Amino acid sequence: MTAVSCGDLIEVVYTPDMRRKTFHYVLNTPACAPNIALAVGPFEIFVDPYMHEVTHFCLPQLLPSLKVSAKYMHEAFEFYEEILSNRYPYSCYKQVFVDEIDEDINAYATMSILNTNLLHSTAIIDQVYITKKAMAQAIAEQFFGCFISMHNWSDTWLPKGISTYLTGLYAKKCFGNNEYREWIQSELQEVVKYEEQFGGIILDPSQAPAPLPIAANTPAPAPRAPDPGFYFPIKNLHTMSPRYIEVLRKKAHLIMRMLEHRIGQELLLQVFNKQLSLAANAAQQKIESGLWSHMLISTNVFAKAIFTVTGKDMSVFIDQWVRTGGHAKFSLSFVFNRKRNTVELEIRQDTAHQRGIRKYVGPLVVNIQELDGTFKHTLQIEGTMARADITCHSKSRRNKKKKIPLCTGEEVDMDLSAMDDSPVLWIRLDPEMTIMRAVQIEQPDYQWQYQLRHERDVTAQLEAIVALQHHSTPATRLALTDTIENEHCYYKVRLRAAHCLTKVANAMVATWAGPPAMLAIFRKLFGSASCRRIIKQNNFSNFQHYFLQKTIPVAMAGLRNAHGICPPEVLAFLMDLFKYNDNSKNRYSDNYYRAALIEALGATVTPVISVQQGTAITAESLSIDTKAILEEVTRNLNLEKLLPCYKYTVSVACLKVIRILQKFGHLPSNPHIFRAYAAYGQFIDVRIAALEALVDFTRVDGKWEDLEFLLDMAEMDPHPGIRHRLVRLMVENPPFERAHKHRLDRPDLVDRIWNLINGMLSHDAKLRCDLVDLYYTLYGTKVPFCLPIPELATIMKPRKAGPPSPEREIKPVPVQHVKHETIDEIENSPAPNKRKSSPNRDPTGPPNSAEHGTEIKRQKIASNQDERGIPIPGEGKVKSEYYSDNSASLPGIMGTPGPVGFEPGMFKKDLEEHKPKSDSVNKSKKKKKDKKKHKHKHKHKHDHKHNKEKEKEKKEKDKGKDKEKDNKKDKDSSALKIKDETLSSASSSQSPEPTVTNEFLFP
């Protein structure tokens, strides 16, 4: 066993019997306590051949994969040291790969603990991008995150944002500018989507932004409605939703990039250099010097550093984007004025009042591509509506000129026959993504087609593809087809174009002529020369073709004919791909390709057209196509057990297809196969796929036992990553919709989640916050739908003014048959107005009537220990305001304030005071109640309660006598009496003789 910790290894000391050893590490650089780590295991050790200060540790038999995965890691060190003009701040660096951790990367001082699943061999393609970026992120966090750490919780955006920004620069160097810009665009879209769903993310909530300056003669702006905020505190990392933290990192990265555009990349890197230099100097001093504060970074320190280096005051920027949440949302439309040769632009911010969206005031860049080139215009946006007349530099020469200069300087030939008289080819808003924004541009379909074909920016091409989904025309079909075939086009644009063509083809199904979309393209690219139907042997040396070969079959599987089913030619084509798949001479693994083919089979499945109710699904009842799909999936799933592939990607795809077949009625809906694959010991990706299917099954067909299975696993599974991922799956696909009656919506569920949140997960803040998200998804911030509303009980049953009753019904120990008895008793009761009492703590008290004055009411309580049990949380019919010290109320279910805990003298033992005169008092009270026609009746355990309907019809005198008789019966049998507003006990059997009698006295 080897122990790995922070700092330099000084010595290893063995005990005399050589059975134990002690590792001594020394860290000479000051470090925060959370940045100290320890990893112990039977590690294999590999010293980096390029940088001897770097050591790698992995579990047994993974050393070959480790050498491949970390082969180019030294380049990241060199890149960071070069752009930051600073040496790596520590004397060594250790990478430890371990199993069963929650996060893929965990950075600590001088060491990082990474997930074993990041390792890969030379035969794997897809994982390389993920692993390289993850290792680069871990190294970047050594500079900002470990060496320079946050000053307060609210400053966490700085180390997260700076380290991710540096990782992005390295990714741009490794994978190219197109990959980098597509990554930035996807992060921006993710932040926008999250903020519009939940609210604006405030990166630094510790200080409110400064108020905007207002001129003396300018009227004050109308105050904006206060943001309701999130359903969790955002000032501490241990209370934030894990999803919120994930999106906060992305937003912090984007804000750093915005800062780069405002002060320049070189100056921003100088700011980082200054902070590192000050910290490196402070690290060599003793704590008495008072310089260690330079090793902490805060928003104010960062703003001052920018001012020191650049001379620019960025306080307005900080207030606008760091201390204020939300993003801008623009809608752009334009009209070409032929007479004046101008473009009349209109930019609206109509949705500025909606959640997560705010009004933007400031400069906004608009790029107009004209016949004579690209022209950049900067508009000043001040209100929610901005108009501008922009003079065009070129006139419409549709048939005179075809060489069009682009923003890159190159000239391209364009077919201008689709144009009208406008010289505008397309318009872009904020093309460099320099602000947090969402953009909607209204322009004709031919302009989107020009933008897709000829714009060189990948983000513009991706925007055009999204827009063309809504323009299903032959011209759009041709533009998308040309994009898929264009070898000079970025591969991710080609993949998106394939999926877009699927939607366009389905919309054009009535007029579509020829073979299914993309079939000819695939056979042209990958079919053998002699017979196009037979696919060539796999050769993944061209990565663009590899990703196309994976994606086109999945896109084609989404095609539908006029009847709404997948064309038979497509299914036959997919079966041929399985049949002729030959990877024998390929240097790369085809596991991701085979998984994609299985995913494509699942995408061809459509719901069963007609099914007779009650007919069992058998092998004979399956259609020929479904049987072929099922046989192929089963064959691959069984083959995986004999010849497992990297990360079991084929098994993951098979499980997803089996769930699709179940969901669409081709297979019996059964969770047992998924439970087997979700068991501890299976590979984590297989478990997650099985759990995803189980979560979906629970939502569609699940019973209470299925939901309990998921909750048990989320609470007790040994793998922390599985616990977290399972709850996230339940948040994304909840077992039922909020505010709708559902068979799974029970008080038991409310109690279980609530108790986990409040008392059981103090050691695991991440899982606790996951469950907070789940609770919010199911119930929001209001009373759960399965719990009766306390106010409704008050309205239905008027009560006497007075202090809350300390009575509390005592429920027997929970047994399954007791629940059935309770249900039977309620169903058999002749009283039509009975309703189930609230399982939460309702404000209770005597009936609210001024006539009753200050009469003393005494209730006799049987306290037989055999009848008593532990009340089930959420099910016990609690009518008291006396809680235990550890109790916690559900949000929105607060009763009338009263004493908390048990007070001295609250329960007074008096066995002799319960005299008949108290019965006469009760008799006179009930006469008055009957005069006012109140419907309050004591609910007893005995058969006399079935006479209550007859009692309504009797005269007042008879009623009083009946009540007196009832009270005598209760006294003789010593039955448990319940307050007016509660139901009878769950037990329908007669109570045994009481051992103790308690009196409750009300003033």
Language-model-derived ranges and their functions:
Residues 464, 497, 552, 597, ...:
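Conserved hydrophobic register position within alpha-solenoid helical repeats
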Residues 25, 56-355:
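Hydrophobic alpha-helical and helix-loop surface patches within well-folded domains
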Residues 445-448, 476-484, 512-529, 568-580, ...:
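HEAT/HEAT-like alpha-solenoid repeats
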Residues 819-1003:
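Extended, charge-dense intrinsically disordered regions
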Residues 469, 502-506, 557, 598-606, ...:
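Structural signature of alpha-helical solenoid repeat scaffolds
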Residues 458-461, 490-495, 545, 549, ...:
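Residue-level detector of extended alpha-helical repeat arrays and alpha-solenoid scaffolds
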Residues 689, 695-788:
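Extended alpha-helical scaffolding segments
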Residues 1-21, 28, 60, 140, ...:
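Non-catalytic accessory/interaction domains
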